[in-house]
UniProtKB/Swiss-Prot annotation:
Residues 9-126 form the MSP domain. Pfam families: Motile_Sperm. This is Major sperm protein isoform beta. Keywords: Acetylation, Cell projection, Cytoplasm, Cytoskeleton. GO terms for cellular component: cytoplasm; cytoskeleton; pseudopodium. It comes from the Eukaryota. The keyword Protein transport does not apply. It comes from Ascaris suum. Gene3D superfamilies: Immunoglobulins. InterPro entries: Ig-like_fold, MSP_dom, Nematode_MSP, PapD-like_sf.
Length: 127
C-alpha cells in the first residue's frame, strides 16, 4: 500500500523563499514550479499564513513521478506601513496517493494515517 511508504522529495523553484517587491498598491503574482522528484504519484496542497493577502492558484493537485506544475502565488494590495509583514509563508504539503486512485485530488488523502510531508517557503517583502 502506498501509505506505508514515506512520500518522496519535491523540488521547488524558487527553492527557499518568495520575494515580493514594493510598491504594494498593485497586485503582484509570483510563479513557483513544483516537481515531484520521487517515484510515486503524490497529492499536494498549499496553505498560507495570510489568506487575506496571499492567494494560490491552483491550491492543490496531483503529480506523477518527475511531473511538474506551475503555481501562481499572488499578493493583494496592502499598506506596508500598517501591516505586519513578519512570519508570512506558504506551506506545501504532500502525500502519496493510494494505489489505484484516480489522478484527481482528494482532501481525505491528508486525513488518514499516511505520512504527510511539508515544505515551508517564507515570504519576504522588500520595502
Amino acid at each position: 500500500m502506498a501509505q506505508s511508504v514515506p512520500p518522496g522529495d519535491i523540488n521547488t523553484q524558487p527553492g527557499s523563499k518568495i520575494v515580493f517587491n514594493a510598491p504594494y498598491d498593485d497586485k503582484h503574482t509570483y510563479h513557483i514550479k513544483i516537481t515531484n522528484a520521487g517515484g510515486r504519484r503524490i497529492g499536494w496542497a498549499i496553505k498560507t499564513t495570510n489568506m487575506r493577502r496571499l492567494g494560490v492558484d491552483p491550491p492543490c493537485g496531483v503529480l506523477d513521478p518527475k511531473e511538474s506544475v506551475l503555481m501562481a502565488v499572488s499578493c493583494d494590495t496592502f499598506n506596508a506601513a500598517t501591516e505586519d509583514l513578519n512570519n508570512d509563508r506558504i506551506t506545501i504539503e504532500w502525500t502519496n496517493t493510494p494505489d489505484g486512485a484516480a489522478k484527481q485530488f482528494r482532501r481525505e488523502w491528508f486525513q488518514g494515517d499516511g505520512m504527510v510531508r511539508r515544505k515551508n517557503l517564507p515570504i519576504e517583502y522588500n520595502l
